[in-house]
Curated annotation (Swiss-Prot):
Function statement: Catalyzes the attachment of proline to tRNA(Pro) in a two-step reaction: proline is first activated by ATP to form Pro-AMP and then transferred to the acceptor end of tRNA(Pro). As ProRS can inadvertently accommodate and process non-cognate amino acids such as alanine and cysteine, to avoid such errors it has two additional distinct editing activities against alanine. One activity is designated as 'pretransfer' editing and involves the tRNA(Pro)-independent hydrolysis of activated Ala-AMP.
GO terms of molecular function: aminoacyl-tRNA deacylase activity; ATP binding; proline-tRNA ligase activity
Protein name: Proline--tRNA ligase
Catalytic activity: tRNA(Pro) + L-proline + ATP = L-prolyl-tRNA(Pro) + AMP + diphosphate
Length: 571
């Protein structure tokens, strides 16, 4: 491709409304342009990267035995009503009516459509297992789209769905998809990590997320220093303490704490160790008989709302009680609540169950208890894992300690079970002629999001440094003053043709531009290999080669450049 025949819409200035580096660089490099909040057009350079992501995903899905189909973006509301998600999904589901006043949605996901399709097309166990996938636009009406295509309202996604008669083939397909996802991100040249994940609103049992590692990532990943165990922070399990609870060494007493509304203030004012304090959080209960539930964690820990949400007595989704509700039930404000003498159900984190001589609110305003001990001052409450893990603590497999990293979720696989197939009566006849509800798996890749995530991981202060597998072009040719030098023009043209003939994607900058502008554009859009041609190089019988990622420069003989580039690409 010649730049003179190409739409290379680069910008010098960083857009003021772009928060993250990938959004800034995608705009500056002319990859995308904003049409409205969360809606973007893909320009040629961006689309070339997007298509490369698609191609790798498609190849690995095909290798995994999945069959490509295409389902509509617009979906009838009847299917969503059938599964109950018409009411549950929330305002992110864009609903509308056609001219006949029939309800439709813009699909944020396709579980309903695929289940409807398969229940009509598949009737016998002999047709299973079956894996189908598509690469299709999705729409979620995000309340505040952010970070460019990282969290847009309209986005491109690969979603695959598998159907099974038994758990054995479900497990086999899940493992095949797990392997395919590892292959996808490895081929793209990305640093990534698969982690155990919560199934969230989609439901199901087993689930893994795939995260591109980046300091700017919104998701916190906890992984073991001594094994392959890894999970997102919502799913990461805290090991149950192995130590015994120490015997009491002091009596429980009350202290006045008028200026201690938080754990930090309590610790500072009374010279307490934060690990000898607990905080008690009041949430809504699941039943009218038990409208409030107390959750108790150590003072230096954070409540894990996803874990707490799974307690049967806790209302789902988890909702904190208001100050008025807390005062009406307990007689004190949130900053003075503790587990002693509470007349509502109490759940404690496992780490709290081994504490002794600890401090907590006294359920009176401006008062706290110190020297609290289980089974002496209050009955030992039901213990559960309800906190976030912290760096350095033991992992549940006992093979290491937790370390933390930031990541951007780009893939998610689920074992859905019968959540959708049962609701939609998606059944087949087994070998005995008996009707059986199909098991389902769901496997998503954020195709457009990968582009942004790859840039978050691969950039410097001069621009984008995409891996070769994703770069819009592999080689850039920069001829210096080619419009004044016939030698430079001729050699540049020959190299351009030779690289094209070799099947190498090449961008020839044939503009009448200053060298500084040409260099800046090539670095901004992130071409992995750049070849500079000038009269001085020709006199010396060499091309100047520069590697975008390493910054390494080499002089390569004129007659060896194509072979050199071929060998560099193979490496």
């Amino acid at each position: 491709m010649r730049v003179s025949k190409y739409l290379l819409s680069t910008q010098k200035e960083t857009p003021a409304n772009a928060e993250v580096i990938s959004h800034q660089l995608m705009l500056r490099a002319g990859m995308i342009r904003r049409n409205a909040s969360g809606l973007y057009s893909w320009l040629p350079s961006g689309l070339r990267v997007l298509r490369k992501v698609e191609a790798i995903v498609r190849e690995e899905m095909n290798k995994a035995g999945a069959i490509e189909i295409l389902m509509p973006l617009v979906q009838p509301a009847d299917l969503w009503i059938e599964t109950g998600r018409w009411e549950k999904f929330g305002p992110e589901l864009l609903r509308f009516q056609d001219r006949h006043n029939r309800d439709f949605v813009l699909g944020p996901t396709h579980e309903e459509v695929i289940t409807d399709l398969v229940r009509k097309e598949v009737s016998s166990y002999k047709q299973l297992p079956l894996s189908l996938y598509q690469i299709q636009t999705k729409f979620r009406d995000e309340v505040r789209p952010r970070f460019g295509v990282m969290r847009a309202r309209e986005f491109l996604m690969k979603d695959a769905y598998s159907f099974h008669l038994d758990q054995g083939t479900m497990d086999e397909t899940y493992q095949a998809m797990f392997t395919a996802y590892n292959n996808i991100f490895t081929r793209m040249g990305l640093a990534f990590r698969p982690v155990l994940a919560d199934t969230g609103s989609i439901g199901g049992s087993l689930s893994h997320e795939f995260h591109v590692l980046a300091n700017s990532g919104e998701d916190l990943i906890a992984y073991s220093t001594g094994s392959d165990y890894a999970a997102n922070i919502e799913k990461a399990e805290a090991a149950i303490p192995t130590q015994s609870r120490l015997a009491p060494s002091q009596a429980m007493s009350t202290i006045d704490t008028p200026n201690a509304k938080t754990i930090a203030e309590l610790v500072e004012q009374f010279d307490l160790s934060i690990t000898s304090t607990v905080k008690t959080l009041i949430v809504k209960g699941a039943t009218e008989e038990q409208p409030l539930i107390a959750l108790v964690i150590r003072g230096d820990h954070e409540l894990n709302e996803v874990k707490a949400d799974k307690i049967d007595l806790v209302a789902s989704p988890l909702e904190f009680a208001s100050e008025a509700e807390i005062r009406a039930a307990i007689g004190a404000g949130p900053g003075s609540i503790g587990p002693v003498g509470l007349n509502i159900p109490v759940f404690i984190d496992h780490s709290v169950s081994v504490m002794s001589d600890f401090a907590a609110g006294a359920n009176q305003d401006d008062k706290h208890f110190i020297g609290i001990n289980w089974e002496r001052d209050l009955p030992l409450a039901t213990a559960a894992d309800i906190r976030n893990v912290v760096e350095g603590e033991a992992t549940p497999d006992g093979l290491g300690t937790y370390a933390m990293a930031r990541g951007i979720e780009v893939g998610h696989i689920f074992q859905l079970g019968t959540n959708y197939s049962k609701a939609m009566n998606a059944t087949v006849l087994d070998e005995n002629g008996k009707s059986q509800v199909m098991l389902m798996g769901c496997y998503g890749v954020g195709v457009s999001r990968i582009v942004a995530a790859a840039i978050e991981q691969n950039h410097d202060d001069r621009g984008i440094m995409l891996p070769e597998a994703l770069a819009p072009f592999t080689v850039g040719i920069l001829p210096m003053n080619m419009h004044k030098s016939h030698r430079v023009a001729d050699i540049a043209e020959k190299l351009y043709q030779d690289l094209n003939d070799a099947g190498i994607e090449v961008l020839l900058d044939d503009r009448k531009e200053r060298p500084g502008v040409m260099f800046a554009d090539m670095e901004l859009i992130g071409l992995p290999h750049v070849v500079v041609i000038g009269d001085r190089n020709i006199d010396a019988g060499v091309f100047e080669y520069k590697n975008r990622r390493t910054g390494e420069k080499q002089d390569i003989p004129l007659d060896q450049i194509v072979d050199f580039l071929k060998s560099s690409l193979k490496a």
